[in-house]
Amino acid sequence: MEINNQKQCIPYNCLSNPEEVLLDGERILPDIDPLEVSLSLLQFLLNNFVPGGGFISGLVDKIWGALRPSEWDLFLAQIERLIDQRIEATVRAKAITELEGLGRNYQIYAEAFKEWESDPDNEAAKSRVIDRFRILDGLIEANIPSFRIIGFEVPLLSVYVQAANLHLALLRDSVIFGERWGLTTKNVNDIYNRQIREIHEYSNHCVDTYNTELERLGFRSIAQWRIYNQFRRELTLTVLDIVALFPNYDSRLYPIQTFSQLTREIVTSPVSEFYYGVINSGNIIGTLTEQQIRRPHLMDFFNSMIMYTSDNRREHYWSGLEMTAYFTGFAGAQVSFPLVGTRGESAPPLTVRSVNDGIYRILSAPFYSAPFLGTIVLGSRGEKFDFALNNISPPPSTIYRHPGTVDSLVSIPPQDNSVPPHRGSSHRLSHVTMRASSPIFHWTHRSATTTNTINPNAIIQIPLVKAFNLHSGATVVRGPGFTGGDILRRTNTGTFADMRVNITGPLSQRYRVRIRYASTTDLQFFTRINGTSVNQGNFQRTMNRGDNLESGNFRTAGFSTPFSFSNAQSTFTLGTQAFSNQEVYIDRIEFVPAEVTFEAESDLERAQKAVNALFTSTNQLGLKTDVTDYQIDQVSNLVECLSDEFCLDEKRELSEKVKHAKRLSDKRNLLQDPNFTSINRQLDRGWRGSTDITIQGGNDVFKENYVTLPGTFDECYPTYLYQKIDESKLKAYTRYELRGYIEDSQDLEVYLIRYNAKHETVNVPGTGSLWPLSVESPIGRCGEPNRCVPHIEWNPDLDCSCRDGEKCAHHSHHFSLDIDVGCTDLNEDLGVWVIFKIKTQDGHARLGNLEFLEEKPLLGEALARVKRAEKKWRDKREQLQFETNIVYKEAKESVDALFVDSHYNRLQADTNITMIHAADKRVHRIREAYLPELSVIPGVNADIFEELEGLIFTAFSLYDARNIIKNGDFNNGLSCWNVKGHVDIQQNDHRSVLVVPEWESEVSQEVRVCPGRGYILRVTAYKEGYGEGCVTIHEIEDNTDELKFSNCIEEEVYPTDTGNDYTAHQGTTGCADACNSRNVGYEDGYEINTTASVNYKPTYEEEMYTDVRRDNHCEYDRGYGNHTPLPAGYVTKELEYFPETDTVWIEIGETEGTFIVDSVELLLMEE
């Protein structure tokens, strides 16, 4: 039975896609194809990435002046059709309307830019271009959320990336030309910082949205795989390829023409899928198709392919192939791939060899043998391979049997339709695999050239997958989506790869190398050329282990030392060292021309300008007020980095001027030891601080010492650093300023205290280095910081002054805080306290170049305000003194009442723990014992407070000494107690109490006593529910007594004055109890319950009294705190006991309900 081949070979896509029709081999498409528009834009960005009117006009011509609303709608429809999701009408209309509005506004901006470009000194033209920039910038910032509406992120993605690209291009214009337009330096720097943030934000959104949808689509069936692969291919062309170029908008990193390359591969569907009906076959699994897609690899180029032929019922088809390829910079068959498919012999093999720029187009003839004919065969029965050749038309081709009608240009259109396809094509064939006998074609973008050519007039970006030799330990892994291709990875020290490069310029030309990388560790990179070492330097960690590879985790860093090539064709090698068991990823290598002479001249001019800007006049008699100590250090770095060869005399002169500036800065600084030579070394001067602060030597940020303040686990014990400015250094009625440089900080609190506290919480996000992403973490020959690489310069416009009383989020790392001084009094010596404090676990800070200096005399309103504040402070001080006299008298009486006499070495007989806490509470009512802002700094009442606190400490010690029962207040959990059954220690009204919840539970302690002596057993407890709670004291033979507690009758509260006077020396040698002593004779009946809920607390809870200052509950925390009175229901009972042996047992239990014990005391009677 004959097959009707004419009907059988109708391509599937001709029937399923009404927008594409093949007539006699020609494609008829809509007016605008989103793929063609995106590829055309991509070609423009790759070849014309130079800012200015030409670039702006190109964007207008390619996108923003060319697309009508109906054509923007095709961008949305493209993805809608792929993922079978319709955008809501309102969302669609809003997106298209806003895209149209952006296009109109961009055209107006383009007109304004061209006007200014033709007359750059015209003030009206400057004003117009600034206005149009700000309008358009605001519109994009306002409208771009409309292109990522939740639920529609995927179908909106291709227009989102167009809006993002427009925005980054606009921001780049303002960064490059903004100051010439009239924008301030601060404004330009703010825009630049925002641009860098949005490069990462836009990139991450596109990649995350793409990956999420790709994972959702899946590829288990062949129908799913076709959609999956088409989505992958088309969004690579319309979204990811454009995203890969976003970093090039960083004009400070790429100030000149930059050439990028896209090394990713895209795949067209197996030829058999274009056959009608086959797509619905359930016999082909999508997973098997995906397995034929190449895994990550070093980039190679198609060299040749041998095609084998088999037949089925006299119909010939392509059944197998063998391929060869070559690496970048080489030619010929360097790599041979194994046979794919079968080596059929129905016809002689056909060899297809690459010509010139490779195969740009394939016309395939699908083949299908139906099941009723026997064996099912899906494949191709004919192919035509067209080669790209710019100077020959029509281009050469190779035909396998006969051409087909399935055109690869339908799936991967040309990038330039103004020329014939062989000249305007966007991709070349890179590899062929097969699923069964159905060929699968892999394609690479033409920007990835077959050689790594270095241009002396441009920045050349070369992905490291274009290497020809991968070293052991290095692997090629799938790119994260925003790199334009796959990347290399190492987890230990070694070489990544060798790359062949071709030099087109003179060999005298010098270059600097940069690396775009991501790393979980600090490390060293090294480079070699033809085996000779060229560069080595330290580079910083960019991410934490386990983090996803996001845009912000990649850094472009370079070596400061330029080099030149000795051969026109050379081998470049990159490796890493000084790390292990971490992850390092390499995206690309960049070769940047180094213009040495120009740099030296520019550096000298910049240094001269910076030095002169330090002084008030040309004779260098005084520093400008706004010149900071940090700025002087940075200017010093500029001078030190000048070339000795080019400008040695000028360098020496400038160095002397900077040293003079530094001496003037030191002279006006009222801080002692501003360079942090020591902390806590001198008791009455210099810096005082917590022991966890570290002083570190200069780094790439600080030229001199700086301090690091870590976080703390308890806000009552903060990390702190402080110093007092003596009254003798201050002038009356003058404003003073504290300022400095913060490398990074979180929750850093800064205080200036005189009459009251000036307070700011400063958060400065750190970059990890002052040096931009374009350089490595610099080191010199001896390991010192190499401050001569390009870095972020100090700019006074970026200074952030915290004077508004609000939390200050600095745009720069400079901070300042001022305070006004009224009348000065050397006797009172009020001075000014300078305090830095961190009281959170996540807090931290690194700061240096601190200054406290006179700012200006107070006049007018400021003078009146400080006089009013001073009077208010003195009135409060008088009131405080009056209150203190009263509170001190009451507290002193309470403390004295605890003791027998003024020797304070014996407690009164009736003194109990509650009385001591009550006295301690009265002592804590004394205000201003310490500064509320930092409780280690003594206040005006520190002397009397510490006097009474010392007596309270003595009282606690005497009380603990006379109670023979260890841990009788359960503040140390169940330590020293034996437990049987389940009991618990709970916090009840800030007290640690023993809870016995079950009648079978018991708690006991063995106690050593002196036989024949008398003891008082005193228990404070509370009974809940029915039954009785019992505390029993007994000896091994007999002599048992007990205290019972019940909730069924009104209990009498026993006084605590039973017994004689108790001394501080009860329990003499031989009668003292050892806590680790256990019950003898009862050890089988009791066991230590290691699973009981034990909460080891400090001896006394730390709480803020309600009647002291409430702005700091840790203000008077000196180890003792509030102990609240006994809650209602607690009863204190006691009994007298006379032991006959040297050991007694205290047992606690109950008969029913719950028994709660606050404390158990066993006190020796006085003889």
Curated annotation (Swiss-Prot):
GO terms of molecular function: signaling receptor binding; toxin activity
Record flagged with keyword Zinc: no
SS bond list: none
Protein keywords: Sporulation, Toxin, Virulence
One of the protein's GO biological processes: sporulation resulting in formation of a cellular spore
Record bears the keyword Electron transport: no
InterPro entries tied to this protein: Cry1Ac-like_dom-VII, Cry_V, Galactose-bd-like_sf, Pest_crys, Pest_crys_Cry1Aa_dom-IV, Pest_crys_dom-III, Pest_crys_dom_I, Pest_crys_N_sf
Role according to the record: Promotes colloidosmotic lysis by binding to the midgut epithelial cells of many lepidopteran larvae.
Similarity comment: family membership: Belongs to the delta endotoxin family.
Miscellaneous: Toxic segment of the protein is located in the N-terminus.
Name of the protein in question: Pesticidal crystal protein Cry1Ja
Species the sequence originates in: Bacillus thuringiensis
Taxonomic path: Bacteria, Bacillati, Bacillota, Bacilli, Bacillales
